[in-house]
């Protein structure tokens, strides 16, 4: 096929400014054995061999039945920049075993990914075990050298996007989700990747300022407990004045807040003497700094007896001067109970002081939240509008790695298979195409792998789908729609598709998830999604298996 037939006409070169967002991703970000294998291939005169590798995973993460594919754009950036610098070559000369021929280093210095072709499913698409999410064709040595880096770029990205998508599903579409995990992430790059791919998976924003700049993700945040505890009395307020939003006249915000606090103490049955004066001072100070964006942490001392009283007083004071507060954050305690208490408080204030917008104040909850926490809060009838989630999200608490693998399936047109006593680790040989078959109601029924030489399944035509390793498991499927999963994304040194924005990938995730039946997505005991092979590929796999499996001998 030529470039035009592959959709590569004209190509798309990677923006070099975008390419260098992470300078760590380079050819030396690999395992040593990739380079020693490359030398052995070179010594064996295999530089002209053409290979096909499949990048796939064997099991879905988090005890679920789907995975979100992410990281493709980063893989394309890596291919675009793939080149060993002179300093790389000098380092390898010092590091590799003695006796490596000088010509090999010259060979490495001239390597690029120009002769590589990369096929992939669209980033943001739901993917399933054994179906390759990336397929790489090209010179054996080059595609071997790509292995570790591609796995690094796909494994965490897909795991993170999947984790975020699961949080989105349990939280519901009307609750905001914010990623607060930078300080708990596995290093700076882990923090950036977590912010990027949590947004991909369905989160609404991040606290990570650099991620906001690099990826155009909405940046959100309030303040820490330290801000509240840095004040101990109202006497510490250096300024109390703020301009009225409409008139521009300077007014004493503290004076308004103190007056409202006295009235609120009767309404809420809370003594002003029990509430923290330092907390009130801190909230007044913060409100003066951000009168249109006032959101306060209310659990520094006592949510009921201090935080809600002081917040409501300052919010009403801002209202006197033409401003509307945004809401509160609760970072400890019984989140279900406290959120209900806060909502009840706001409703009382709205009615008593004739401020209907108080009913719409946002309640943000944080504090080591995970999937199970949200499910429990849902059962308790919480009133939380937004979750700030950090540690368990970015560290993927329930499963720290996805386990993608990169396996040789064909060389010089000849299929290759890896055998194992563990059937799960037997590879599916040969160059393959993948199709997703849909029912009449638009739900995905099954993913089907075929040899590239086979014609694609046809709409309305019966297709025999077989389990790749269990002979008795087979079924006829009559698809109402057939989707070819692979597109050529890289060929002849060019990107062959218009790359989507992060926002478009994020939308793709939700669209793709909607194609799955609810029983595939449920948290408890989800129904496994079926992945099958064609009858032709089934016979091909098992014939090759028998050809390569040693025959035992008993005596």
From Swiss-Prot:
GO terms for cellular component: cytosol. Nicotinate binds at residues 33, 180, 222. Gene3D superfamilies: Aldolase class I, nicotinate phosphoribosyltransferase. Activity is highest with Mn(2+). Its cofactor is Mg(2+); Mn(2+). Transiently phosphorylated on a His residue during the reaction cycle. Phosphorylation strongly increases the affinity for substrates and increases the rate of nicotinate D-ribonucleotide production. Dephosphorylation regenerates the low-affinity form of the enzyme, leading to product release. GO terms for molecular function: metal ion binding; nicotinate phosphoribosyltransferase activity; transferase activity. CDD domains: NAPRTase_A (cd01570). Its EC number is 6.3.4.21. 5-phospho-alpha-D-ribose 1-diphosphate binds at residue 391. The modification Phosphohistidine is found at residue 225. GO terms for biological process: NAD biosynthetic process via the salvage pathway; response to oxidative stress. Belongs to the NAPRTase family. Catalyzes the first step in the biosynthesis of NAD from nicotinic acid, the ATP-dependent synthesis of beta-nicotinate D-ribonucleotide from nicotinate and 5-phospho-D-ribose 1-phosphate. Helps prevent cellular oxidative stress via its role in NAD biosynthesis. This is Nicotinate phosphoribosyltransferase. It comes from Drosophila melanogaster. The lineage of its organism: Eukaryota, Metazoa, Ecdysozoa, Arthropoda, Hexapoda.
